[in-house]
Amino acid sequence: WLKVYTTIDPDLQEKAEELVKKQVAINKSQYGASSAALVSMDNKNGGLLAMVWGPDYFDIEHGGNNNMVIAKRQPGSSFKPFVYALAISKNPIGPESPVADMKTNFGKWTPDNYDRSFKGIMTVRNALAYSRNIPAVKMFYLGWREEEIVKEVRSFGMSTVVENAGYGAPMAIGTAEVRPIDLMQAYSVFANLGIKRDVHAIEKIEDSDGNILEEYKIEENKEPIFSPAS
């Protein structure tokens, strides 16, 4: 027989399942949505701590046994920080630099904000914090080209964002589909000051005599994939 050691934290897994059930109940009453997913990891070593892809695995009618954690979905505003990171890394701008949140025609597209209002001149930091759409699109253009942004987010782990897909500027507000587990890994890069860790669920595997057959080893002295300053 084999003994498999996983990275899953039983307490966090239980709490994650409870949270998903509660949130699904809210989503169902407000939006008619019957499912949700949650995935978490240790930013420092990439170990998967909890993973839930629905309130009830056996609820086949509502896709309970479909793993939504690896399903492609539009990330919406959660994609914006990556656009900002590239813009800041390629331009002489920072968190306190001004950016205009006002009605702007980007050629064939004039986007709006969620609340249908405009805040005028604000800092880059606040534009991201308040999730304003127009500044995010401006950051997209400061990131040089769509290919540059695709290359960056793929380096963060979002492998479902592909080249030559024609996302265009709407990509800045999250139209390119990603997998929740990849988005989680990408966000961990921010928390880990630019260091990307591989997501894994198995720590080690031993045989019946206690011999280690396989063991995950973290890569030491790994170079950051982007500047911590960004």
Segments from the language model and where they lie:
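Glycine- and acidic
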Residues: 1-4, 62-70, 133, 163-171, ...
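Active-site SXXK
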Residues: 16, 45-46, 66-99, 127, ...
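Generic, well-ordered alpha-helical scaffold segments in large soluble proteins
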Residues: 15-23, 90, 130, 139-142, ...
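Mid-domain, small-residue-enriched loop/turn segments at the edges of structured enzyme/sensor domains
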Residues: 110-113, 143-185
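Surface-exposed patches in mature extracellular/periplasmic domains of secreted proteins
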Residues: 3-4, 26-38, 96, 160-171, ...
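A penicillin-recognizing enzyme superfamily signal
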Residues: 6-29, 38-42, 51-52, 59-69, ...
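Conserved catalytic neighborhood of penicillin-recognizing serine enzymes
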Residues: 44, 93-149, 196, 208-230
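Short glycine-rich loop/turn motifs
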Residues: 33-38, 45-49, 113, 123-125, ...
